[in-house]
């Protein structure tokens, strides 16, 4: 009977979910998530495909301009916009970041401008991202971007 009890306790210990102390979430993680999101936008701003791929997961997905896009599709959209003369200025505001061991979520306002010079107009986006931690660090797995229409003038 004693052996059965020991075996039962051993199985229960192995099958129990890991405690939060095994995988802490810290202010440093919040800062790393913030940097990972900003690194993705920095790569897009200068059409740096290598840096973009380092900043996102292989299965990255974006909801942008009312469409679902892969990482390659989003990169090409921005790169082609730049090649056509369009300027896109992003200014990512403070982020709200939440997370746990291997996943994180971030949300922010992005206030900037876009257009073909000299017709550059103010733009505002509300954005959020889901990130995954890997051995290489935090990577953006999903981006959702919604353009906010300018307020009508009275």
Predicted regions and their residues:
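A short hydrophobic beta-strand element
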Residues: 101-112
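Beta-strand elements of well-folded, non-transmembrane domains
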Residues: 112-116, 131
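A solvent-exposed, acidic/Ser-Thr-rich amphipathic alpha-helical stretch
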Residues: 49-100, 119-121
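Short beta-strand segments enriched in hydrophobic/aromatic residues
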Residues: 44, 56, 110-112, 144-147
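Short, surface-exposed coil-to-beta transition loops
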Residues: 89-92, 107-109, 122-128
């Amino acid at each position: 009977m004693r052996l059965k009890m020991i075996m039962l306790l051993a199985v229960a210990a192995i099958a129990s979910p890991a405690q939060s102390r095994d995988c802490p979430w810290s202010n440093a993680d919040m800062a790393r998530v913030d940097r990972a999101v900003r690194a993705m936008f920095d790569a897009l701003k200068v059409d740096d495909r290598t840096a973009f791929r380092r900043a996102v997961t292989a299965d990255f997905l974006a909801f942008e301009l009312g469409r679902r896009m892969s990482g390659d599709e989003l990169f090409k959209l921005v790169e082609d916009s730049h090649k056509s003369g369009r300027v896109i200025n992003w200014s990512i505001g403070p982020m709200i970041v939440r997370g746990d061991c291997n996943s994180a979520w971030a949300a922010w306002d992005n206030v900037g401008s876009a257009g073909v010079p000299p017709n550059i107009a103010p733009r505002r986006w509300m954005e959020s991202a889901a990130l995954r931690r890997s051995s290489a660090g935090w990577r953006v797995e999903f981006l959702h971007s919604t353009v906010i229409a300018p307020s009508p003038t009275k």
